């Protein structure tokens, strides 16, 4: 009974801390989903329903953040941001504008489950607008350009054998001051132009895989023949791509 009471107390304290560190910004009209948002577990749904693996970890939630000069290679956290909501949005808890002269930094810690030992760990981003540099334990894992497509990295080589791991993401977004695809986003939004979307705006998550695994698949149907052809994108133990 004592153990149960202590556990419930810890959970309650964690939820209280989350509520104190985050609140929607501004007086924007909210949907029922926004009204009931839990900052300790935003968007908890499995992010890839067409190819489900039972083991995975959702990294959404409160991260440290800072806005620095674009050329900066380091940062000092200035507050909390709720991932996966864009910097400019109310639900991020920040509601701040961004320019091409800025860099947006994210930081959080995570622990790899013991049950993942011997597996490769894949880090997934549903979308980050626009250019992202990803670091694990201060090791640059990879870069991605594009605000609308998902991307992933095998972070296994950068992981420590045990204990807390550190994940950092540096984002730059020029919006309409560059060539990048942006829809109707505009830094000076008025009329038909929308407020920009900067930073992580889709689920961040990890999963363990074997050294050889299926990364993706594509299905093409032939109605006349009554057939479906599958193209499988796989990775071998040697790192080769097989299709």
PLM features per residue range, with description:
Residues 64-68, 96-97, 101-216, 237:
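Accessory beta-strand-rich segments of carbohydrate-active enzymes
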Residues 2-8:
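Sec-dependent signal peptide recognition
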